[in-house]
């Protein structure tokens, strides 16, 4: 049978899809579907429909006649990360660890030019995560450069480095971050030809799956020596990113502390407030917060 591939909608397509699904929904004057379209790169048509339906439910539950921009932003977070789990009781030590972990991600993002700006930081559990740092793409991307990938690995490791730097210990909370960092590094080496030692060669097919009738030994098409070099290169990429995180967070320790203290006090931090950590740390929003380097 003939198969037709339908790609993800671009920014114009997303805005048109949003308009279609918003036709019979009352929108407040502050709503900008154009802004929502910009913030939803990677969303499918179904995701966008779900976003508007969730926003309508939020407005109804709040007794509002119109869907506000705040409703749409919360609905977007729900689509991305799942619903908030405010009923979950988080012990103080776990809350503190999560605050520094997420602050670590955010500060590293801020310091790396290729990364998308922070949209929101939260230590309220969502889905299976204890906290989350959301950065939204400013444009649609069809590819990523080596520098972008290297810096994205650093972002993944920012939480783990912050734990070690501030708390003097590490936790299992960074498990998914480490898996993601390792996966990106391995793809750089084996799929994207971004290793100087191994050259512009792909060591994996489009799918790494082992099919029926094909053994694990047959699935690998390179020698033990090359496998060892791949592991060395992956480790080198991840280790370099880790050291970069250490440098960033050591130099930006006061910003790391202020971000974490704000999260402990308020649980959620907007991208605008996070920017003030760097541009206006004496702003009244931080009043009463004493970043104690401990």
Question: What label would you give each PLM region?
Answer:
Residues 5-73, 78, 82-83, 156-164, ...:
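Conserved C-terminal "switch" segment of AAA+ ATPases
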Residues 47, 104-105:
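Short hydrophobic/aromatic residue motifs in ordered secondary structure
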Residues 24, 77, 86-87, 208-209, ...:
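Intrinsically disordered, low-complexity regions
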């Amino acid at each position: 049978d003939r198969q037709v591939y339908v790609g993800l909608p671009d920014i114009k397509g997303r805005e048109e899809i949003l308009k279609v699904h918003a036709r019979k929904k009352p929108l407040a004057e502050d709503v900008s579907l154009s802004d929502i379209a910009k913030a939803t790169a990677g969303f499918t048509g179904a995701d966008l429909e779900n976003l508007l339906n969730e926003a309508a439910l939020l407005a109804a539950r709040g007794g509002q006649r119109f869907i506000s921009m705040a409703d749409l932003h919360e609905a977007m977070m729900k689509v991305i990360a799942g619903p908030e789990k405010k009923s979950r009781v988080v012990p103080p030590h776990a809350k503190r660890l999560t605050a520094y972990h997420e602050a670590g991600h955010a500060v590293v993002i801020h310091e790396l030019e290729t990364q998308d700006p922070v949209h929101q930081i939260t230590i309220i559990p969502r889905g299976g995560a204890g906290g989350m740092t959301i950065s939204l793409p400013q444009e649609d991307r069809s590819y990523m450069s080596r520098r972008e990938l290297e810096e994205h690995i650093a972002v993944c490791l920012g939480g783990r480095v912050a734990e070690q730097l501030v708390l003097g210990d590490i936790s299992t909370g960074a498990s998914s971050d480490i898996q993601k960092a390792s996966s990106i590094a391995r793809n750089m080496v084996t799929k994207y030809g971004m290793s100087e030692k191994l050259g512009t060669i792909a060591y994996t097919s489009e799918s790494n799956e082992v099919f029926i009738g094909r053994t694990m030994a047959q699935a690998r098409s390179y020698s033990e020596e090359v496998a060892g070099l791949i592991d060395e290169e992956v480790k080198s990429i991840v280790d370099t990113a880790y050291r970069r995180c250490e440098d960033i967070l050591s130099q930006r320790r006061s910003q790391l502390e202020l971000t974490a203290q704000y999260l402990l006090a308020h649980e959620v931090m907007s991208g605008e407030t996070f920017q003030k950590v760097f541009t206006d740390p004496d702003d009244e929003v931080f009043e009463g917060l004493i970043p104690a380097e401990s």
